[in-house]
Amino acid sequence: MTTLARNKKATHDYEIIETFEAGISLLGTEVKSSKAGKINFKDSFCKIEKGELILYNVHISPYSGASIFNHDPERPRKLLLHKKEIRRLQSKVQQEGLTMIPLEIYTNNKGLIKVKIALAKGLKKYDKREKIAEKEYERRIRKQQKYENI
């Protein structure tokens, strides 16, 4: 499994509740660009429309080797999941007020490009501060234990 791109802000801005693996429908030039790692996740999200899961705001840079037959970098991309999983996701999003965000794009052992999506809950500003303070406290404890063991 090779990670092509990771959404670094996702764990900072959201509380991850559950993760899923989905296939993604890409054009040929998008596959080449994504395998080169030219993907940007900034402000990306997933939405269910007409029973299909769609990925928005993922920028895949145009492939330099393709002349005029390049893709639109910002186009919405269809994610491939079973209908049962899509219905389950839709019910959770509607009932619990969760959002779906992509966490990472990677290739599996067969060379297929997959997207790890998450059901997440947005964090408020005070939650983020609390999380940062908690991490800082844990870091201090680990540092202190390290020096005591020496």
From Swiss-Prot:
Subcellular location, principal: cytoplasm
UniProt name for this protein: SsrA-binding protein
GO biological process: trans-translation
Pfam families according to UniProt: SmpB
Coiled-coil residue spans: none
Organism encoding this protein: Petrotoga mobilis (strain DSM 10674 / SJ95)
UniProt-listed InterPro entries: SmpB, SsrA-bd_prot
GO molecular function: RNA binding
Domain of life: Bacteria
Keywords for the protein's UniProt record, in alphabetical order: Cytoplasm, RNA-binding
Similarity-based family: Belongs to the SmpB family.
Subcellular location as annotated: Cytoplasm
GO cellular component: cytosol
HAMAP family referenced in this protein's UniProt entry, alphabetically: SmpB (MF_00023)
Biological function: Required for rescue of stalled ribosomes mediated by trans-translation. Binds to transfer-messenger RNA (tmRNA), required for stable association of tmRNA with ribosomes. tmRNA and SmpB together mimic tRNA shape, replacing the anticodon stem-loop with SmpB. tmRNA is encoded by the ssrA gene; the 2 termini fold to resemble tRNA(Ala) and it encodes a 'tag peptide', a short internal open reading frame. During trans-translation Ala-aminoacylated tmRNA acts like a tRNA, entering the A-site of stalled ribosomes, displacing the stalled mRNA.
Keyword Translocase set for record: no
Gene: smpB
